[in-house]
Amino acid sequence: ILSGLVGSEMCIRDRYTVLTEGDASLDPVAEEVRSILDGHLVLSAELAQRNHFPAIDVLQSRSRLMDRVVEPEQRQLAGHLRALMARHADIELLLRTGDYVAGSDPLADEAIARQGAIEQFLRQDAAETSGFDDTLRALRKVLG
């Protein structure tokens, strides 16, 4: 995504698609593209295989412009969502092996408690539509 101004309004000016095979972080072309674009959405084959659509890997996707185009509340909510998702990813092996000790990490405990709601929030049927206000309200509820 490459942004720019149209009059006094910020807008998406261009969209580019880069197809990588395997780990995109090892692909020099993908890394170069990430370095120059204002934002990128990373699609995950693993999410698609789990029937999670849209298959956007939130933790790998970035926006350099988010702080400039969203209200402080939305920025805070999105940051908290990402923090919970990152912590859950950090402890996933401990959860699978039964080695996580509840109460040892408040953020991890919250991530575990909200994981189902987060996954449901991030899924959307192809025919489903959701306006901005409805989406923000749903995000507040997930993190509530």
Model-predicted regions and their roles:
Residues 1-7, 12:
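Single conserved hydrophobic/aromatic residue that forms the stacking wall/gate
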